[in-house]
């Protein structure tokens, strides 16, 4: 029978239950259920042989839905944790949530009718806030788990839990007993919209803020001993000029600051003489549109203790010295209001100035502001002060000034600096110890160390009190008679015990007799409990104590903290401040920071632009699934591994499509490997290393190189290197090279042939190690591969199988250098084959005969050995025709005959030509052979396939049907 197709069922085609399509929306939850049902994470975290590894979770805020930044953060953490698990360490990951604070309180209040808010007691508000936070935690927890993130989701840490609150009060108490906590009347960032003090980490600086800046003169009324002989003649009309961007603070002005080391000039301005910094005379001439003439100069320190008249109030103020005064802007003299600025306050303390802060909690001028009382400082107050200065003849100029100005991060409204009674952590008391601790930490990227060092070096004392109800109370009482705070070891320990048992609601539920320890219930004094709560950064900054140090199986210091780069001024800082203050060391050994997620054009994501990427839609798809297809969690995880997280990272629809393409390539490669192992059992069929052909040993060398690189990528947290290496391995090394060549021996050989089993040996090694390598990132795909292995393994899950297993003997650089040359030749051959294919000279490369010339004699001998003319002495693998996927290869002694060919390439060292193959096409392997047609029994077969068919018939594996076709015998 000579009809084509009679042998097509005699080839070994791939078989696997591993789908080509991921169907992630259905399959990923099934795999997550498998992990949960078999407690894979729990067993490994308890029973792995290595030491304990704790990546301590920075708590997201329990408010609203998760955004793409949450996904980036949690997936990075999970990638590290899973790598450590595969390395054999006992990974203990406890996810956490930040549950107190103003944003949740505001959410609760927004959901209550205005008329009912007045009836809301602090306790009822707290109950509603707790309920809101817990519901949000539950919702966010499900989302995080859908990302494939492993951890102790059954028992996360919540800052509202009694045991956490008690540990936090313990940290506060230790700091207080060491003298690091004090109460002071100082300027703090104050949010009129929230009516509470804010920490620096609760501020944001939006683009586009414009202030009304003013240049103002104050009339000099008295000169210091040093200045008098120099300036006395100008005194009747001598004035100091100041510049400010906060006109509303002028009623709080008590001094004017100069830099002692700057030179100041007296300039003639019309009828007046003005004192300004000499370096700014030229700039001010232009700004104030006035021709200033320098009359005299003198050092700033000469003006100390001179006096001036406030232009709006019947009081004089001194000229004082401050190193912070510069010539970067303004006049070189700074209007100083100790109640409205940190540096102003410090100068005020130095010179014994009063603390004047004539503004109340909602940002309204008090009676101390005289005619401005009742005006809101940021609205009518600014305008009124400017008009009053104009009327007093003290206003030189007003202009708009665009600059960075602090806003409340939650209400998105401007804040002010306002002196109030607050509780502070005295950072000065332990600043040097914190700086020393920072130097012991491994910061990734390295510039993080400079960033946090600079912030801690320059920061002021930490205002830790808040005037809100939803938080952990500051455990202090005040003496009714004296107002003195009662805060000592006995009171803190007593309250800590109550909170541990009943939670912080007890502060509002219990009366003083229950909250005070025994001696203070009857000491002749009466006390009232404080109403302030702690800054939420103190909440989360105590997590090392409440979680790492308190939970038995964890570790303190933790191995790692990992958050966004904004946490250098947030959680990283509050954590190291509290840890160093109480225990003298950092709470972490390594700190890794990542950037923010931007769109593909590098813009911030915002609903108004419409460029927001919602992780839930990435995973499950949007309403329009053509527009927003369901990619599943692994594609999202793959994106996280692909970016250089050290800076801001882009994401959008095009990038997601690219990630999905890479995902599919890895999946299709894995599917090919699985499909061609369907009849392979490593225990019985694996070929020993010394018996492998050169090509297979070269691939094991490449596997060693590739997976060593992958290991180094994970160890150095450079996940983008993992992404590039694995993608390149799957596409370039496997699909385009090894697997392309392997198809012939996998499909055409007898099932148990050495050339096939040796290839399957390499496929199994590649597949198992690929599954392990991708498991930290493509967790679902890796598990899907492992569960689809067609042979038994001793490990229930890919994660239980440990990290990649590479044998020393596989490393063979000498062999690799030979095969690198062969691959380069193959590339050139492929280019000529492609040219012939494009111009329809050939269809498949098997229709071609390759003519090859090399100038190097040694290489020529090596190629001769790979090109047996009769098949004798060959292992039927390491042959040029298989390498090039051509039916024949002819080695030329000289390149001169190549010139006559239509399809050819020549260089100084290499010549390639392509012509049509000799003979006819074999119906089974599709190679061309002059043998086809010679056999009476099998005229359609080549001399390679004929004996294979005869052997398969003899072994009873195939038989001839009545229709004259060969088919496998069913067992």
Curated annotation (Swiss-Prot):
Q: Which pairs of Cys residues are joined through disulfide bonds in the record?
A: none
Any note on cofactor binding? Binds 1 zinc ion per subunit.
**What does this protein's UniProt record list under function?**
Catalyzes the attachment of isoleucine to tRNA(Ile). As IleRS can inadvertently accommodate and process structurally similar amino acids such as valine, to avoid such errors it has two additional distinct tRNA(Ile)-dependent editing activities. One activity is designated as 'pretransfer' editing and involves the hydrolysis of activated Val-AMP. The other activity is designated 'posttransfer' editing and involves deacylation of mischarged Val-tRNA(Ile).
Motif 'KMSKS' region: chain residues: 604-608
GO MF entries: aminoacyl-tRNA deacylase activity; ATP binding; isoleucine-tRNA ligase activity; tRNA binding; zinc ion binding
A Pfam short name: zf-FPG_IleRS
Enzyme Commission number(s) from the entry: 6.1.1.5
Source domain of life: Bacteria
Question: What is the annotated quaternary arrangement, including any partners?
Answer: Monomer.
From the UniProt record, report the name of the gene that encodes this protein: ileS
**What cofactor does this protein call for?**
Zn(2+)
Task: Cite the binding residues for Zn(2+).
Answer: 922, 925, 942, 945
* Catalytic reaction(s) noted: tRNA(Ile) + L-isoleucine + ATP = L-isoleucyl-tRNA(Ile) + AMP + diphosphate
In which residues is L-isoleucyl-5'-AMP bound? 563
Q: Which PANTHER family match?
A: ISOLEUCINE--TRNA LIGASE, MITOCHONDRIAL, SOLEUCYL-TRNA SYNTHETASE
Q: What is this protein called?
A: Isoleucine--tRNA ligase
Residue ranges for motif 'HIGH' region? 60-70
């Amino acid at each position: 029978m000579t009809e084509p197709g009679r042998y097509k069922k005699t080839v070994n085609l791939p078989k696997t239950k591993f789908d080509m399509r991921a169907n992630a929306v259905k399959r990923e939850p099934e795999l997550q259920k498998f992990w949960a049902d078999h407690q894979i994470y729990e067993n490994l975290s308890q029973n792995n042989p290595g030491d304990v590894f704790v990546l301590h979770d920075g708590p997201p805020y329990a408010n609203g839905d998760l955004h793409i930044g949450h996904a980036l953060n949690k997936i990075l953490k999970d990638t590290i944790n899973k790598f450590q698990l595969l390395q054999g360490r006992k990974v203990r990951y406890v996810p956490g949530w930040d549950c107190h604070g103003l944003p949740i309180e505001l959410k609760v209040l927004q959901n209550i009718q205005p008329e009912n808010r007045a009836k809301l007691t602090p306790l009822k508000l707290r109950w509603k806030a707790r309920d809101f936070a817990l519901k949000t935690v539950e919702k966010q927890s499900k989302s995080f788990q859908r990302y494939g993130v492993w951890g102790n989701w059954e028992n996360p840490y919540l800052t509202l839990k009694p045991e956490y609150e008690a540990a936090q009060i313990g940290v506060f108490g230790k700091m207080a007993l060491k003298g690091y906590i004090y109460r002071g009347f100082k300027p703090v960032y104050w949010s009129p919209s929230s009516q509470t003090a804010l920490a620096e980490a609760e501020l944001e600086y939006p683009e586009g803020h414009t202030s009304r800046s003013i240049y103002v003169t104050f009339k000099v009324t008295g000169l210091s001993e040093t200045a008098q002989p120099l300036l006395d003649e100008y005194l009747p009309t001598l004035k100091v000029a100041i510049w400010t961007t906060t006109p509303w603070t002028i009623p709080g002005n008590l001094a004017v600051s100069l830099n002692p080391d700057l030179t100041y000039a007296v300039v003639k301005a019309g009828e007046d003489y003005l004192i300004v910094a000499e370096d700014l005379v030229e700039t001010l001439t232009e700004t104030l549109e006035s021709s200033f003439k320098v009359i005299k100069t003198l050092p700033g320190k000469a003006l100390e203790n001179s006096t001036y008249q406030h232009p709006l109030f019947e009081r004089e103020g001194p000229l004082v010295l401050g190193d912070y005064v510069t010539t970067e802007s303004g006049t070189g003299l700074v209007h100083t209001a100790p109640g409205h600025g940190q540096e102003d306050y410090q100068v005020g303390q130095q010179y014994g100035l009063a603390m004047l802060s004539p503004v109340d909690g909602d940002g309204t001028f008090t009676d101390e502001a005289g005619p401005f009382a009742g005006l809101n400082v940021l609205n009518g107050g600014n305008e009124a002060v400017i008009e009053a200065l104009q009327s007093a003849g003290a206003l030189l100029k007003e202009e708009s000034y665009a600059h960075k100005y602090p806003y409340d991060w939650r209400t998105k409204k401007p804040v002010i600096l306002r002196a109030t009674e607050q509780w502070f952590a005295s950072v000065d008391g332990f600043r040097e110890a914190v700086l020393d601790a920072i130097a012991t930490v491994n910061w990734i990227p390295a510039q993080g160390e400079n960033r946090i060092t600079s912030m801690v070096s320059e920061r002021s004392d930490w205002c830790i009190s808040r005037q809100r109800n939803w938080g952990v109370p500051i455990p202090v009482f005040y003496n009714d008679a004296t107002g003195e705070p009662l805060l000592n070891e006995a009171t803190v320990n007593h309250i800590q015990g109550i909170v541990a048992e009943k939670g912080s609601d007890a502060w509002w539920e219990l009366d003083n007799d229950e909250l005070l320890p025994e001696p203070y219930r009857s000491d002749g004094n009466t006390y009232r409990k404080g109403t302030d709560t702690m800054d939420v950064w103190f909440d989360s900054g105590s997590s090392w104590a409440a979680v790492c140090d308190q939970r038995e199986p964890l570790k303190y210091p933790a191995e790692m903290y990992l958050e966004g780069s904004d946490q250098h001024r947030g959680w990283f800082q509050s954590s190291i401040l509290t840890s160093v203050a109480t225990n003298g060391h950092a709470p972490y050994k390594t700190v890794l920071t990542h950037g923010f997620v931007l769109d593909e054009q590098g813009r911030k994501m915002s609903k108004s632009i419409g460029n927001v990427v919602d992780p839930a839609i990435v995973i499950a798809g949007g309403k329009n699934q053509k527009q927003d297809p369901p990619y599943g969690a692994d594609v999202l995880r793959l994106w996280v591994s692909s970016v250089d997280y050290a800076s801001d990272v882009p994401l959008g629809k095009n990038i997601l499509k690219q990630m999905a393409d890479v995902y599919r390539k890895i999946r299709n490669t894995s599917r090919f490997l699985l499909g061609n192992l369907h009849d392979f059992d490593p225990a019985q069929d694996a070929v020993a290393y010394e018996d492998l052909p050169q090509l297979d040993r070269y691939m094991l060398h490449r596997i060693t190189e590739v997976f060593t690189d992958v290991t180094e990528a994970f160890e150095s947290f450079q996940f983008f290197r993992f992404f590039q290496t694995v993608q390149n391995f799957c596409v370039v090394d496997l699909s385009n090279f090894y697997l392309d060549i392997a198809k012939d021996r996998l499909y055409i050989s007898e099932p148990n042939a050495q050339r096939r089993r040796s290839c399957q040996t390499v496929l199994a090694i590649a597949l198992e190690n690929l599954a392990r390598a991708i498991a930290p990132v493509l967790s679902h795909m890796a598990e899907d591969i492992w569960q689809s292995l067609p042979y038994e393994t001793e490990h229930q899950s890919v994660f239980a199988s440990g990290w990649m297993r590479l044998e020393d003997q596989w490393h063979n650089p000498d062999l690799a250098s030979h095969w690198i040359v062969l691959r380069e030749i193959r590339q050139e051959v492929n280019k000529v084959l492609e040219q012939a294919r494009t111009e329809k000279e050939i269809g498949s490369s098997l229709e071609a005969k390759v003519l090859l010339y090399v100038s190097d004699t040694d290489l020529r001998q090596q190629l001769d050995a790979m090109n047996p003319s009769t098949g004798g002495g060959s292992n039927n693998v390491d042959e040029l025709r298989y390498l090039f996927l051509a039916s024949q290869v002819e080695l030329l002694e000289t390149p001169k005959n190549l010139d006559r060919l239509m399809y050819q390439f020549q260089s100084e060292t290499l010549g390639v030509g392509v012509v049509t193959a000799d003979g006819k096409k074999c119906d089974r392997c599709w190679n061309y052979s002059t043998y086809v047609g010679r056999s009476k029994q099998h005229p359609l077969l080549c001399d390679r396939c004929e004996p294979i068919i005869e052997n398969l018939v003899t072994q009873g594996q195939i038989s001839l049907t009545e229709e004259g076709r060969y088919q496998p015998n069913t067992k």
